[in-house]
Amino acid sequence: YAMKRTLVPEILAAYRSLALENDIIVIEGAGSPAEINLHENDIVNMGMAKMAKAPVLLVGDIDRGGVFAQLYGTIALLKEEERAMVKATIVNKFRGDVALLRPGLTMLESLTGKPVAGVLPMLDVDIEDEDSLAARLERRKGDAVLDIAVIRLPHISNFTDFAALEATPGVGVRYVCEASSLGAPDLVILPGTKSTIADLRWLRQSGLEAAVKKLAARGVAVIGICGGYQMLGMRISDAEGAEGGGEIGGMGLLPVETEFANEKHRTRVRGTALETGGILAPLSGAQLEGYEIHMGRTLLSEDATPLVRLENGMPDGCQKGNVYGSYLHGFFDSEGCREAILGALAAQKGVSLQAEPFDLKAYKERQYNLLAKRVRENIEMNMVYRILDAGV
């Protein structure tokens, strides 16, 4: 918290880089712009809007209740120069007849001096949304023929890795945080994490490490992604103190060792799937792409089997029997990759998934188009465009 203001030059550099490439930039705030106890060092709401000299649309979530108090109270608590930057309000996630809201909207406009740009109804669209993460974690699919258990680590990251699996017909994805609820899935996934060592300790203390190892010994496929891959190895060392220092033994399911470093590796990658066995065998020779974001490096033993040969010639990932690990986020987004893995799991189980391929990109496009259509129908877009043209 104390270092937030020191990040401003980096934030401005990122903003200016985006501004060189785009005509319109949408800046999404975080939480409320009227947290008066945090106002002085704000860099994500009105603070960012001031840095970018951006006009503001204030959006209130009516589904949580008290939307008029939210909008009026927020504007009242802003400083005068910030109130002037707010050009209009929007009511989001409304259920019911908008006519019932109109008297309140008229009063809100009178009280704030700001027009209401529209009322967006609650929409049934499948779009990755951090604000609905809790509901997503509890979601169940009644028609699932394949059961995939993702270990819900305390510092789990990159939920988007599993969106493609969640959207695939016939595939059920559960997020598991207790050994007693792990059950007998067809596939266990150890996801990425913002704190590998702390989450490995939690995995051990919760009994989930033992439960996952028991399933692996019975032949259940286990895949680790990024931090999950690191956990599956023999050892993790943190000589530079990236996560507090020290060393910890891994789960011992893959013949690899990880050495942390303070510098984070971030890059988009492409590669070719190597010849392996088990559920990844159908991928041999397939072109894969994704991105890496991790600290340090993972070293394979001499007799280890890598999963992917990257374009730069380096290996990625490792396989031993029915256990697999990789640094590639977005592993399941590739249609061919996902279909091959799910098809192999279905064949092992003796069930069949739908015959028609599931086109994730087309599915996502339909969801975004539906959202755009509803926004155009319910928001006064001409007002929004005028606000954009006028600026602050």
Where are these regions (language model features)?
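Hydrophobic/aromatic ligand-binding patch that stacks against planar heteroaromatic rings
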Residues: 47-48, 108, 214
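Short glycine-/polar-rich loops that comprise or flank the Walker A/P-loop
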Residues: 52-55, 84-86, 249
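C-terminal lobe/tail of nucleotide-utilizing enzymes
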Residues: 39, 61, 68, 72-174, ...
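ATP-dependent carboxylate-amine ligase catalytic core
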Residues: 1-51, 62-76, 81-83, 96
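Glycine-rich phosphate/ribose-binding loops and adjacent secondary-structure elements
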Residues: 175-187, 195-197, 201-206
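Structural motif
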Residues: 24-26, 57, 90, 189-191, ...
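Cysteine-nucleophile active-site neighborhood
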Residues: 193-279, 284-289
